[in-house]
Regions:
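Amphipathic alpha-helical segments
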Residues: 39-119
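Amphipathic, charged alpha-helical segments and their helix-to-coil junctions
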Residues: 25-27, 31-37, 43, 106-153
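Short hydrophobic "helix-edge" motifs at membrane interfaces and signal-peptide entry regions
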Residues: 4, 37-38
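Sec-dependent N-terminal signal peptides
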Residues: 4-19
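Charged, compositionally biased N-terminal leader segments and the immediate start
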Residues: 20-24
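A short hydrophobic/aromatic micro-motif that marks alpha-helical segments and, especially, helix-coil
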Residues: 15-17, 62-65, 102, 136-139
Length: 153
């Protein structure tokens, strides 16, 4: 049941990620963030003694992740406009931005893994890391299954 919920959530987010205004993106991210918290709490078990610390850090993490998410959505929108006629220069510029966004996301996850481990313990931090990577990978898969390769006809 959890996999079905996650799949539906990812599909909903992916479908709505294209060609939206910043206001719509922010609204979607807030809705997704609330639903995502339910998924995270289904897998991360901080226990009563660490719940408040975990939730505070997770909320802080989500705010920063959502800012990075806006960049990823903008990059997907750019790709949607250019994929069928993308030049080498456009591909290089786009990939530079994609790789930069991925690196920033990875740094953010590592940073919050360390913060959560310090505030709770290594098990809770590992659970956070695992569920976060699972969700991000699932979203990435859903997106890439639905977009064509550069120059594909």
């Amino acid at each position: 049941m959890k996999k079905l919920f996650i799949t539906a959530l990812i599909a909903f987010f992916t479908i709505n990620a294209f060609s939206q205004t910043n206001h719509e993106i922010e609204l979607m991210q807030k809705i997704f963030g609330l639903e995502k918290l339910q998924i995270v709490l289904a897998y991360v078990n901080p226990g009563e003694e660490h719940t408040e610390a975990f939730l505070d850090l997770y909320e802080e993490y989500e705010e920063k992740r959502m800012e990075l998410g806006k960049v990823r959505i903008e990059l997907l929108n750019q790709y949607a406009k250019e994929w069928d006629g993308m030049t080498n220069e456009q591909a290089e510029a786009w990939m530079k931005k994609v790789l930069d966004a991925s690196a920033k996301r990875d740094v953010l996850i590592r940073k919050y893994y360390a913060k959560i481990k310090k505030a709770t313990n290594a098990i809770v931090a590992t659970q956070f890391y695992q569920v976060e990577i699972f969700i991000l990978t699932s979203i990435r898969l859903a997106v890439y299954e639905n977009i064509p390769f550069v120059g594909e006809k």
